[in-house]
UniProtKB/Swiss-Prot annotation:
Protein name (database record): Fibroblast growth factor receptor 4
Pfam families for the chain: I-set, Ig_3, PK_Tyr_Ser-Thr
Binding of ATP, residues: L471, G472, E473, G474, C475, F476, G477, Q478, V479, K501
Glycosylation sites: N109, N254, N286, N307
Residues annotated with Phosphotyrosine modification: Y640, Y641, Y752
Modified residues (Phosphoserine): S571
Disulfide bonds: C54-C98, C168-C220, C267-C329
Membrane topology category: Single-pass type I membrane protein
Primary localization: membrane
Any one Gene Ontology BP term: positive regulation of DNA biosynthetic process
Biological function: Tyrosine-protein kinase that acts as a cell-surface receptor for fibroblast growth factors and plays a role in the regulation of cell proliferation, differentiation and migration, and in regulation of lipid metabolism, bile acid biosynthesis, glucose uptake, vitamin D metabolism and phosphate homeostasis. Required for normal down-regulation of the expression of CYP7A1, the rate-limiting enzyme in bile acid synthesis, in response to FGF19. Phosphorylates PLCG1 and FRS2. Ligand binding leads to the activation of several signaling cascades.
Length: 800
């Protein structure tokens, strides 16, 4: 009999439930009650798990409650000499005895009571098992998970730039401590750009603005004197890659409506970059759906606003027969465009019942139709191929209602107004387009004309443009000075000096697409005093010209260096300006204007990604204008070690998250603005002079920043340091920068600081990367973060 009971006991030893949240949550030996044989009272909190051993020898011991032996399975169980309660409830209170098998000797005699004064274990306060003055002994517990159900998500896959939070809520008595490991090594975040936040009271680890280098296994280790438990999370950071908008398949969908009803067409757009969305309706002009060049006529029904959330839905109220036809959702960003189409069928009201009956009848014969259509599929395909070939020869355009029609004929859309013969004006907007080949010849050698659609809002007559001397050039493009007659419509006989961007003869299709993309981006962004504005385009009967504002005084770096005061350590690269040195308010004004331009670009959801003094142009009236904000830069193909044509290293203007992980945001532009501030107050100095690139990387990771330039007030240096905070979220916004610089402008006057004084021993003319940095001439401040509080109204940088 005893043998049979022993065998049954062995088979029943498998737990019916587990106190662990995963296989990685280690089970430690359970504690024994404090005393043996003597009666003991333990106070337990509601919801707390209980695990007690019956003496030093667990074999041959059984637990009883109120005289009844506990089963070896269930929420409350006694097995292998252990008393286990998964979650303590009021009905679990009472007297428990541990008896030795055979002799029935009382090994333990204890009473469990629930103390309502104790916080529930559901409370996230880890001090659940604090001491009490009631005289009762509180249950000593090895660490345990209080909310294992919240820890079930092991894999966290998030886009770069997001915030990640790992939680391991636990409790125990004595109160356990928590430590974090990354890939098996102690993790304190000291080498992570932006640092980490450890919230021990919430058992959590928080990392802001994650980057691909944050990938790995993160383990929480919770321990006290009675044991330890651990749990691991896997973090995968998905690197953002620039791409054109993605449209959800099947949307917009074909729709059938009745005259007088309302219709909604939905277009779901996914895009990292701010998309520009248009709803288009295909229309007929003079009996034709297509122009002479084969491109469709399209009416623009709805266009996105910068803050619009309703543009993805096209609402058609009280539809009529004229509303029937093909509708297209067109979405574009700085990378490219995507579009999908659907058909709207409008039925007369009296045909509604007939249509329903017909649809029901058709559904009954669906199977028959499928079989028949399958047998005729080959014949139909041959017929369609013949019809298509005939249409291609004769230029006949036939339209068929399909669920999604990919209109490859107008990937680049332009809007213009159709002039009516009767009134001279029309509210009807048309879009026509051109296809850029991605499979044709790689070069546009000998290009003399480009078949781009006419855009009367921006088209400028080519014969009124006289090209002059080159202002700058790259491998495949160039900028020339030009004279434009009648650019100002109010003064048609006046000539204006402009700058014209164009392609060289050896430009590729990709270069052409980039120039068109820049042109479209400038159209979408609009006008502002502190950016280079688009004035017009030449797209007809010749090469593509993009006409922009002309800046007579060149870029800001040259402007600053030409106005350096005389001295042994400051000398201009070229001829010294006759206008003399700049005053301190003039320098602050330069920074203020650039900040205003960047604030506007930020409001238009435009990330510059290459903000530097060389990309800020200066007009004849000393107005700062940000340039090259519409360029489509391939950030995944940047050679970070390659110098630019003028010898400067782009990496020196890049934020750490952009430099190391290629994450570009408005806050990475703020970092670059801080470098630009440094350029301004060194009068065009080269950042990090004498610092090799390899050393620069490690210095930035360690938190080192450039020291204060000579004659730069501590307030403005504090502003630079705020821009250089390691955590992107802790940097100021451009709106805050504009407000801070505006206050400085109001406070200063011409007598505040005269830069005609000779500068200190620092020379910004040092080499960029050829020499090494010694301790005596280092431009780095070796304190990782500001030593004094920021005078500006945004969060102060904190040491990480």
């Amino acid at each position: 009999m005893w043998l049979l009971l022993a065998l049954l006991s062995i088979f029943q030893e498998t737990p019916a439930f587990s106190l662990e949240a995963s296989e990685e949550m280690e089970q430690e030996p359970c504690p024994a009650p404090i005393s043996e044989q003597q009666e003991q009272v333990l106070t337990v909190a509601l919801g707390q798990p209980v695990r007690l051993c019956c003496g030093r020898t667990e074999r041959g011991r059984h637990w009883y409650k109120e005289g009844s032996r506990l089963a070896s399975a269930g929420r409350v169980r006694g097995w292998r000499g252990r008393l286990e309660i998964a979650s303590f409830l009021p009905e679990d209170a009472g007297r428990y005895l541990c008896l030795a098998r055979g002799s029935m000797t009382v090994v333990h005699n204890l009473t469990l009571i629930m103390d309502d004064s104790l916080p529930s274990i559901n409370n996230e306060d880890p001090k659940t098992l604090s001491s009490s003055s009631s005289g009762h002994s509180y249950l000593q517990q090895a660490p345990y998970w209080t909310h294992p159900q919240r820890m079930e998500k092991k894999l966290h896959a998030v886009p770069a730039g997001n915030t990640v939070k790992f939680r391991c809520p636990a409790a125990g008595n004595p109160m356990p401590t928590i430590h974090w490991l990354k890939n098996g090594q102690a993790f304190h975040g000291e080498n992570r750009i932006g640092g980490i936040r450890l919230r021990h009271q919430h058992w959590s680890l928080v990392m802001e603005s994650v980057v691909p280098s944050d990938r790995g296994t993160y383990t929480c280790l919770v321990e006290n004197s009675l044991g330890s438990i651990r749990y691991s999370y896997l973090l995968d950071v998905l690197e953002r890659s620039p791409h054109r908008p993605i449209l959800q398949a099947g949307l917009p969908a074909n729709t059938t409506a009745v005259v007088g009803s309302n219709v909604e067409l939905l277009c779901k757009v996914y895009s990292d970059a701010q998309p520009h969305i248009q709803w288009l309706k295909h229309i007929v002009i003079n009996g034709s759906s297509f122009g002479a060049d084969g491109f469709p006529y399209v009416q623009v029904l709805k266009t996105t606003d910068i803050n619009s959330s309703e543009v993805e839905v096209l609402y058609l109220r009280n539809v009529s027969a004229e509303d029937a036809g093909e509708y297209t959702c067109l979405a574009g960003n700085s990378i490219g465009l995507s579009y999908q189409s659907a058909w709207l069928t409008v039925l007369p009201a009296e045909e509604e019942d007939l249509a329903w009956t017909t649809a029901t009848s058709e559904a009954r014969y669906t199977d028959i139709i499928l079989y028949v259509s399958g047998s005729l599929a080959l014949v139909l395909l041959l017929l369609l191929a013949g019809v298509y070939h005939r249409q291609a020869i004769h230029g006949h355009h036939s339209r068929q209602p399909v669920t999604v029609q990919k209109l490859s004929r107008f990937p680049l859309a332009r809007q213009f107004s159709l002039e009516s013969r009767s009134s001279g004006k029309s509210s009807l907007s048309l879009v026509r387009g051109v296809r850029l080949s991605s499979s044709g010849p790689p070069l546009l050698t000998g290009l003399v004309s480009l078949d781009l659609p006419l855009d009367p809002l921006w088209e400028f007559p080519r014969d009124r443009l006289v090209l002059g001397k080159p202002l700058g050039e790259g491998c495949f493009g160039q900028v020339v000075r030009a004279e434009a007659l009648g650019m100002d419509s109010s003064r048609p006989d006046q000539t204006s000096t402009v700058a014209v961007k164009m392609l060289k003869d050896n430009a590729s299709d990709k270069d052409l697409a980039d120039l068109i993309s820049e042109m479209e981006m400038m159209k979408l962004i609009g006008r502002h005093k502190n950016i280079i504005n688009l004035l017009g385009v030449c797209t007809q009967e010749g090469p593509l010209y993009v006409i922009v504002e002309y800046a007579a005084k060149g870029n800001l770096r040259e402007f600053l260096r030409a106005r350096r005061p005389p001295g042994p350590d400051l000398s201009p690269d070229g001829p010294r300006s006759s206008e003399g040195p700049l005053s301190f308010p003039a320098l602050v004004s330069c920074a203020y204007q650039v900040a205003r331009g960047m604030q506007y670009l930020e409001s238009r959801k435009c990330i510059h990604r290459d903000l530097a003094a060389r990309n800020v142009l200066v007009t004849e009236d000393d107005v700062m204008k940000i340039a090259d904000f519409g360029l489509a830069r391939g950030v995944h193909h940047i050679d970070y070690y390659k110098k630019t044509s003028n010898g400067r290293l782009p990496v020196k203007w890049m934020a750490p998250e952009a430099l190391f992980d290629r994450v570009y945001t408005h806050q990475s532009d703020v970092w670059s603005f801080g470098i630009l501030l440094w350029e301004i107050f060194t009068l065009g100095g080269s950042p990090y002079p004498g610092i090799p690139v390899e050393e620069l990387f490690s210095l930035l990771r360690e938190g080192h920043r450039m020291e204060r330039p000579p004659n730069c007030p501590s307030e403005l240096y504090g502003l630079m340091r705020e821009c250089w905070h390691a955590a992107p979220s802790q940097r100021p916004t451009f709106k805050q920068l504009v407000e801070a610089l505006d206050k400085v402008l109001l406070a200063v006057s011409e007598e505040y600081l005269d830069l005609r004084l000779t500068f200190g021993p620092y020379s910004p003319n040092n080499g960029d990367a050829s020499s090494t940095c010694s301790s005596s001439d280092s431009v780095f401040s070796h304190d990782p973060l500001p030593l004094e509080p920021s005078p500006f109204p945004f969060p102060e940088a904190q040491t990480t």
